[in-house]
Amino acid sequence: MKALAIFILLLVFFLPETVHASDPVPLAIGAAAPDFSLPGTDGKTYTLKNFAQYKFLVIVFTCNHCPTAQAYEDRIKQLAADYNSKGVGFVAVSPNDPEAIRLDELGYTDLSDTFQEMKIRARDKQFNFPYLYDGETSAASKLYGPQATPHVFIFDGKRTLRYTGRIDDKEKPGTATVHDARHALDALVAGKPVPVEKTKTFGCSIKWPDKRDFANQAVGEWAKEKVTIDELNGEQLQVLLKNEGTNYKLINVWATWCGPCVAEFPEFVNMNRMYRNREFELVTISLDDINRKPNALNFLTKKQASTKNYIFNGDKYAFIDGLDKNWEGSLPYTLFIAPGGKIIYGKQGVIDALALKKVIVEKIGRVY
């Protein structure tokens, strides 16, 4: 069943979505670069004129969430560093509408593709090029017609398109053997014809605004999933903590009467939907009194927590000592455990959701 879920997720990521007849076609070789006016993560607004000092211009359509795009982030930075002194300017554009992205398309990332999250990625990765947001309407991106993230367009001094396609031939960092974008730049800088002007592009499909219905459909499907809660005793807790499977486990301890628990709980539901098709499992444990099991189930149902949910049926202090010796006992409490039972992350109190997602994705992996 999990293998089928992963296969479906791969289809969502990578298959061409031919049902969208309005998907744009790539700009043709020899065409002029369409102008744009887009906000950058650095607070500036950029048009083509902002790059007039460069003899050549590389526009890369990329995004935060896509594992392929993330796999190429460092390579794009390296290209920008290598060719800046040769008169080559670089700019990255995110064409994706954030509202057209399903949570289960975020399984390889800590960040989605909102403008605010782009600012975080640009800061975290210290991009050495402007990173522009076109997710409001995707209008500028449609004029270029990127087919996947990442997709490279290289223009000469007259801003005529000379190369379009992939960066290189291998997604996995350090394994490329054909460096198409680099070869194109070398030729242009040397005043020679580009050896290969156009290639196909492998990566995540562009999340155009007309794909919002697809994302909304997922929300409706998740709302129909069954929610259950089982009782958990001390022996079962120890088995759970040994984590003898292959998945990383995120354990959230909560109660219906705990205000901070209730406030942060939707973050865990989101993380479950993001990462559950990976080597990841969310487990929630309620410390409500056992006679309030129906109340706990009612809360979980309202929150659509269709994960593995428990309510502890033993002594609370025995539970505290049995879960984590470093836990003082206040709720909420969160643990992230590796296969084999090693505690990677422990937090008493409300989590920093972004920080926790970073911990998770660095363990389960950002790329294929």
Annotate each language-model stretch with its function.
Residues 36, 150-167, 331-346:
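A short, hydrophobic beta-strand/beta-hairpin element that forms part of a small beta-sheet core
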Residues 36-57, 228-249, 269-274, 320-323:
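A short beta-strand-turn-helix
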Residues 18-35, 177-178, 182, 188, ...:
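N-proximal helix/coil linker or "cap" segments that precede and/or mark the start of modular domains
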Residues 87-111, 127-137, 279-293, 305-315:
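Thiol-based oxidoreductase modules, predominantly thioredoxin-like and allied folds used
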Residues 110-149, 153-154, 162, 297-331:
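Short, internal strand/loop/helix patches
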Residues 63-75, 253-270:
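Conserved redox-active cysteine motifs that mediate thiol-disulfide chemistry
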Residues 1-24:
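Bacterial Sec-dependent N-terminal signal peptides
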Residues 55-57, 62-65, 247-249, 253-257, ...:
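Short pre-active-site segment immediately N-terminal to redox-active cysteine/selenocysteine motifs
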